[in-house]
Amino acid sequence: DHRYLHSFPTRRSSDLRVGGQPREGFQAVRHKTPMVSLDNAFSFEELADFDRRVREISGREKVEYIAEHKFDGLSMSLLYEKGRLVRAVTRGDGSTGEDVTPNVKTIRSIPLAVETALLKKAGIPESFEVRGEAIMTRKAFEELNEQQEVQGGKRFANPRNAAAGAVR
C-alpha cells in the first residue's frame, strides 16, 4: 500500500513535482519473486493454499499481508533502493513484466523517494518493494472520457483500461 510511503516525505515528494509525458518502448523485466495472484477464494482452505504457495515461492516461513477491497487495475511492482524509486514493473505474466519506470515517475501520487532515516526508524530496509494496483477512480475515469470526447479521441471502455493506458 503506497499510501504508507507518504508518511516519509522528501524534497522530491510527489506533491511537489509536476507530471510529465509518458515515454514509449518497454523493456521486459523478470520479477525477483513472481507476482502471484489470488483467484476468488471461497474458503479458508483456498486462502491457506495461497499462503502456502507464497511462502514456497518466497522461501520465507512467515509472510505478512495487507488486504484491501478488490480494485480492478494494473498490477505493479515498485522497487526502492536507498529510499529512491529505481524501477516500476507491470505484473505481466507474473514472472516477467514491462519496465514502465519513466511513465510511473509522472504519476504524482507515487513517491520518487522516501527519507532513509525515517525508513530505518520504522524498521523498513532502505531497499524494499511495494506491490499493488494502478487504479483510476470512477470520477477521474468519467472526466477523462469527457476530455477524450471533446478532443475527438477514443473513449476508454472501463477504468482499468484507462489506468493501464496511463501507465503503458
Functional labels for PLM-detected ranges:
Residues 1-6:
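Short, exposed "boundary/linker" segments that immediately precede the start
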Residues 7-168:
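RNA/tRNA-interacting regions in translation and RNA-turnover enzymes
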